[in-house]
Amino acid sequence: MVQKFQSPVRVYKYPFELVMKAYERRFPTCPQMPIVLDCEVIKDESLEDGAKRNTSRRCKLAVDAPYIFKKLIGVDHVYFLQHNFLDLANRTLSIEAVNESFSSRIEIFERCRYYAHPDNSEWTCFDQSATLDIKNFFGFEHSMEKMGMKQYTQTTLKGKEIIEFFIGQLREEGITHVERWTSPSDATKSPTLDQASDQQHSILLDGDFIARSLGQLSPMQESKLLELRKMLDGVDDLERVPSYQTILRFLAARDWHVSQAYAMLCDSLRWRREHRIDALLAEYSKPAVVVEHFPGGWHHLDKDGRPVYILRLGHMDVKGLLKSLGMDGLLRLALHICEEGIQKINESAERLEKPVLNWSLLVDLEGLSMRHLWRPGIKALLNIIETVERNYPETMGRVLVVRAPRVFPIAWTIVSAFIDEHTRSKFLFYGPDCAHMKDGLAQYLDEEIVPDFLGGPCKTMIHEGGLVPKTLYKMNSLEDHDDEVTAELPTTAAAQALVPGKRLSANQQHDHRNLYKSVDLKAGFAHELLIRNEDPKSVLTWDFDVMRNDLHFTLYRVTQELPEKNDSAVSYFDLQDFVEGVNYFREEPTLICRHKESVQGSHVMHHNDSYLMHWFSPSGAQLNVFYEVLSSANYKGSMTSLQSAFSSNSSAASSVQSR
């Protein structure tokens, strides 16, 4: 396979003639390039009254490889042929180099160009490209490919340094200017620089632009960036070419695999066009429920210049927002935040005059409970995560998660499987200890911008959140959101989807069909669900809506074996010798649940016993109910630093009601 390399344009802020004077001093050898052992001039001719000069050299290079490799191939050095074509009239130098040694087994071709900057005649541009085609090299093809990449990187890094060194040497000798070439008859100079036209877009990607806008990139990364940029020129329906910052993010997201990044970027560009994302900032208007009840907003800049977005997730009424906005509305809100983030990143980079490529997220989890793990809400969150990761890769620089409560390890287990591993590494977690948390935040936020709700001095303009009034709901019941079915238990697919590290789509893990059961309770009767636990420390979670009248809910642990019930109207409490404190125990206190309330909760099942969920209504009621058992293997050891701050005797979370 032919390997191709391409450098961006390097700009020397010196005239072409002075750069050529410095370039000549690197021959036959120079200390900055010890790999070059000697250069012999084999041809040197001057043409057109000295306007052109063609020089060929045979260069002897040391083999920069392990000793055993050099012994196997039988040589300590190799030879290259270099051909220089200097055009003083047009102020260009083209350099071509090919390998003489092992030319039947490997083909190396390098092309470099020096030319006057098209926009500033007092500056000089340099670009470099190379191809490496290894046909057969004694079974060491992969090793040769790695050495070729290493050599390209070294020569690219050294090239500008060498020219700068010799320009400094000339300056010390009092040479700061070299006259331009003129013909003996004082003829008008030829038009300049036709060769630069084939890389017109690369002029913008010079070394200064990279340092100022993209940060430190290796020569190989620069080459891949240019390769992907050129590939986009061939996209027919491309309305506008993405910025180099965007191209860089997609490359980084695909670990610098150009073909994968190209496919991902093209898919994203189609998605943006289909959904009019480019017009989102201008067209989107925040609904009233977002303005009044969404606890998130932009803050200041962190210490690295990244814009900071604060989300008080623990104060968010997930169910209320989802029922008011719908899945699409919540996704559109998230996309609007992402578009704002890109805008603020660019503004920060321009203002600070340094590379800023992503933003930071500060997530406050105070108040997080099992109500935030409402299944449709989880589905919406995972849909947002998948969409953002596909279309806004590497825009999240750091995620600071603060005041994480005891329920958080369960939530993290569910959600983290859908977050890219590289993105997960950007999460930093702080427990409920605010004093310790402030010290930790000081590494990333200036003290004066630490939010007041975290004990800092800075007031934020972020809404407190709270429950969304049901008058704003577009959907009045779970039936409107999930198809009702009669299946009482969820399939095992949900449990299988919670295997740590396994990434599935949101639809695979959180298909809401077959989850909720509608139950009619007659006056004075109970509804009971028996869970036989064979996995100590697994977590029982529940979510139900009271659709009519009030009811009582209690969780019991049963130590004796209970028979299967054939009649749902019969309660286990009607059995003889069924005595509280003897063979059953109240694990959660009885909760009175009012009409239209939504209840979410969880309980760590420490014992290898049965657990009984019990609903009772004195006057008859209706509810929609879902429960699930999370295996202990899915969260045990996860977030241990957070769990250590919790009481070992406390349950994972108590029931939480939202009205």
From Swiss-Prot:
Question: Residues in domain PRELI/MSF1?
Answer: 3-175
CDD domains in the cross-refs: SEC14
CRAL-TRIO domain residues are: 286-462
Q: Which UniProt keywords apply?
A: Mitochondrion, Phosphoprotein
Summary of the tissues where the protein is detected: Restricted to the developing gut and central nervous system (CNS).
The entry's localization annotation reads: Mitochondrion
UniProt-listed SMART domains: CRAL_TRIO_N, SEC14
Q: Name one GO cellular component term.
A: mitochondrion
Q: What is this protein called?
A: Protein real-time
